[in-house]
Regions:
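Catalytic beta-strand/loop cores that center a nucleophilic Ser/Cys/Thr
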Residues: 380-463
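Short, surface-exposed beta-strand/loop micro-motifs that present aromatic residues
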Residues: 38-43, 204-209, 435, 439-448
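Active-site/substrate-binding loop(s) of hydrolase catalytic cores
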Residues: 28, 48-50, 60-190, 209, ...
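A glycine-rich, often tryptophan-bearing local segment used as a flexible ligand/cofactor-contacting loop or short
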Residues: 318-396
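Extracellular ligand-binding/catalytic regions of CAZymes and related secreted enzymes
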Residues: 236-258, 333, 357-362, 367-370, ...
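Active-site-adjacent mobile loop/cap segments within catalytic or ligand-binding domains
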Residues: 197-255
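Aromatic-Pro/Gly-enriched surface loop or interdomain linker
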Residues: 256-307
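Short glycine- and acidic-rich boundary segments immediately preceding or forming the N-terminal edge
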Residues: 6-39
Length: 481
């Protein structure tokens, strides 16, 4: 999810939806300070409830990503108010606490709101958030968090729970939210449960005690490594509430909308894929790229229609192919065939290739000549076309390599690939012998499939120091023109 230019993106989105009855007002809290963070008021123009959604209170939790996606939603009555990155500096630095707060007692933002013994919020950021909360007068407040579940070895975990004000425990809508959260939970240890009373000093507790608001803290489980699934649980909870309040105007899998000058990138985040946070950060900081994590189920349900580029990361090409399944693979093929871009690195490059042994996509006209060569730093010589496309003046690059494909010929009847770079060193497998020569084979290639463009790299430029610009050129080149 794009942290760095979200305000610009959403403002553009408001103008792009001029035909919609919704208007979007952006309120900057702590404007002009390092803690500055935007709050969006999405107004249907019709009388109805006010729902406030907060994310990023703790910067290392993925609630901010879900809230940022919800900020792209519309409502058919009432107002949806979204504060995606309450602790914005913490979100940028992936830290739970406020990194710039010098007073250690105030570093946990979600302990700084009014309590029964202290009517005033503590610290400038908490004061601004509290003032905004009072100004919008929410009927419901949902604060999106993550925790670890309560297990035999972890007795105080709050992960996989909805924490509500005690009087709300018997409300039918609360049990309905619980059902929504559990619709995609397969691990019984991660099933959501109800807990009472948000902790004193939290925004939810303050809103419940002092504003009479229906306040809920939604805690997904950080034991679930799939970030896209955790953010979807948050979206399902919020969407179910909007539906019960007759406010919903779109489904829970709306993540983004088209914006002028912004390339929307879907990051594969499921079995077989290793999308690193550092890679996500590099894309986000580019300024013209908006990223969201998607899993196999979301791809099957058509979420790629909202994107310009699909990024398949390292990991296991076979694992990604299996997780996508026959239907998901066909969805990706049609996405590229219809003009979508495809960027594949290592495992993602395998996934795009042709193979008679594995259920790869087959959208790249290159066969797999060898696999599992090992790990090393390799020398790649760029072709003239490669230097031009990647914006690189150097002829040779040192790139991290980890079992990427060694490509061989494709099908003569299909569009030929263009080689951007070739291996100039060998990586010899330690557990077997091979007669396949790696040196001289393609390391980076491009191709077309229908109206879409494909660019794949066997080694890892995205995780090699100094090659960020090359990686970003790959993504931008794949985007539809």
């Amino acid at each position: 999810m794009m942290r760095w230019v979200m305000a610009v993106v959403l403002a553009l989105g408001c103008r792009a939806l001029a035909a919609s009855p919704c208007t979007i007002q952006t309120n900057w809290l702590c404007a002009g300070t390092p803690q500055a963070t935007p709050c969006y008021v999405i107004d249907s123009g019709r009388t109805g409830p006010v729902v406030l959604v907060v994310g990023g209170m703790h910067g290392d939790e993925a609630g901010w990503a879900a809230a940022g996606q919800i900020a792209a939603w519309q409502v058919r009555r009432g107002k949806l108010v979204v504060l995606p990155q309450a602790n914005r500096p913490g979100v940028f630095q992936h830290t739970r606490l406020q990194p710039a707060e010098s007073n250690a007692a105030l570093r946990d933002l979600n302990r700084n709101f009014p309590t029964k013994t202290n009517a005033a919020p503590r610290g400038a950021l908490a004061a601004a958030i509290w003032a905004q909360t009072k100004a919008v007068k929410p009927d419901w407040l949902l604060d999106l968090h993550e925790g670890y579940p309560k297990l035999a070895t972890r007795t105080n975990g709050v992960g996989s729970s909805l924490i509500v004000m005690t009087p709300m425990l018997t409300l039918p809508v609360v049990s309905n939210l619980l059902d929504a959260a559990n619709t995609i939970v397969t691990n019984t240890a991660q099933r959501f449960r109800l807990l009472r009373q948000p902790i004193a000093g939290s925004l939810a507790r303050a809103a419940g005690d002092r504003l009479g608001c229906h306040a809920v803290i939604a805690e997904t489980s950080r034991d679930n490594p799939n970030i896209s699934e955790r953010t979807r649980q948050h979206r399902l909870i919020v969407h179910r509430l909007l539906r019960k309040l007759e406010m919903d105007a779109n489904g829970p899998d709306v993540l983004t909308r088209r914006q002028p000058g912004v390339i929307r990138v879907a990051l594969y985040d499921d079995s077989g894929g290793h999308t690193r946070v550092s890679v996500e950060d590099k894309l986000d900081r580019a300024g013209d790229l908006e990223t969201h994590r998607v899993d196999g189920g979301m791809i099957e349900r058509g979420v790629l229609e909202q994107f310009d580029v699909f990024f398949a990361p390292g990991g296991s090409g076979s694992g990604q192919a299996r997780e996508l399944g026959e239907k998901g693979r066909e969805v990706v093929r049609k996405f590229v065939q219809g003009g979508g871009g495809y960027v594949g690195i290592c495992a993602g490059a395998y996934l795009a290739s042709r193979s008679t042994k594995r259920p790869y996509l087959g959208i790249l006209n290159a066969g797999i000549a060898d696999v599992d060569r090992g790990r090393d730093v390799v020398t790649v010589e760029l072709t003239e076309a490669g230097r031009k496309l990647l914006g690189c003046t150097e002829r040779e690059l040192k790139i991290n390599y980890h079992n990427g494909p060694v490509w061989g010929p494709g099908q003569k009847s299909a569009p030929a690939c263009e080689v951007l770079g070739v291996f100039r060193t060998e990586v010899f497998p330690t557990n077997r012998t091979t007669r396949v020569t790696m040196s001289g084979t393609p390391a980076l290639i491009t191709g077309t499939y229908g109206q879409g463009r494909i660019i794949c790299s066997s080694p890892h430029p995205e995780s090699t120091a100094g090659l960020d610009a090359i990686f970003l050129h790959m993504v931008r080149w794949a985007a539809p023109k």
